[in-house]
């Protein structure tokens, strides 16, 4: 969902399709000769604005299509933008012994929610990290590392969708850009996702 920052005098949720004449990152990259690929979930519209060169849907309505991604990265021979949209860490939450109450440092108020959901929520985050790690291994394996920028971001933080509190505003944002950003660099710069395209 695209929010046109500054075009409204009040803050509201814009849960509508993007206007057809809006230039999206996908349309701009395609005009510049890139293939634009979506792998995973999709609930953006209309297709005229988000016009994918290829779309690889989720596997079993849940998992990233790693085999399709691997095949694409092995054979692609032109500039590309691969957008990976994971379902994680959304539920369902698996039962797991890998995480317990001691691992949860921001406890919700409902202790039953902590015991029944948060360990599975944390496990989903770990599973998401594992899947994305496999994609990075593919990027490296097929020789794309030095010519690729990898951006990882989320639409909100810890269970904070539609919130202007910390959990809605503080989100993960990780960039791997060989030759431009030194590994293990951290920044306190304030940014939003709308800063990515002009940057």
Residue positions per predicted region:
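The substrate-binding groove and active-site-proximal loops of carbohydrate-active enzymes
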Residues: 12-19, 53-61, 111-127
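Active-site-proximal cap/lid insertion segments
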Residues: 44, 70-197
């Amino acid at each position: 969902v695209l929010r046109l920052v500054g075009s409204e005098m009040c803050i509201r949720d814009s849960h509508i399709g993007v206007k057809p004449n809006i230039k999206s990152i996908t349309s701009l990259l395609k005009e510049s000769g890139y293939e634009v690929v979506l792998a995973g979930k999709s609930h953006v519209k209309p297709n005229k604005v988000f016009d994918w060169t290829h779309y690889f849907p989720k596997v079993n309505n849940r998992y990233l299509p790693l085999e399709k991604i691997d095949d694409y990265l092995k054979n692609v021979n032109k500039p590309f933008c691969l957008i990976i949209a994971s379902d994680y860490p959304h539920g369902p939450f698996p039962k797991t012994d890998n995480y317990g109450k001691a691992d949860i440092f921001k406890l919700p108020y409902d202790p039953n929610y902590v015991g029944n959901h948060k360990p599975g929520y944390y496990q989903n985050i770990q599973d998401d990290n594992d899947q994305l790690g496999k994609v990075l291994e593919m990027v490296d394996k097929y020789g794309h590392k030095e010519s690729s920028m990898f951006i990882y971001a989320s639409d909100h933080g810890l269970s904070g969708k539609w919130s202007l509190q910390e959990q809605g505003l503080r989100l993960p944002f990780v960039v791997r850009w060989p030759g431009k950003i030194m590994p293990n660099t951290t920044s306190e710069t304030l940014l939003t996702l709308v800063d990515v395209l002009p940057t």
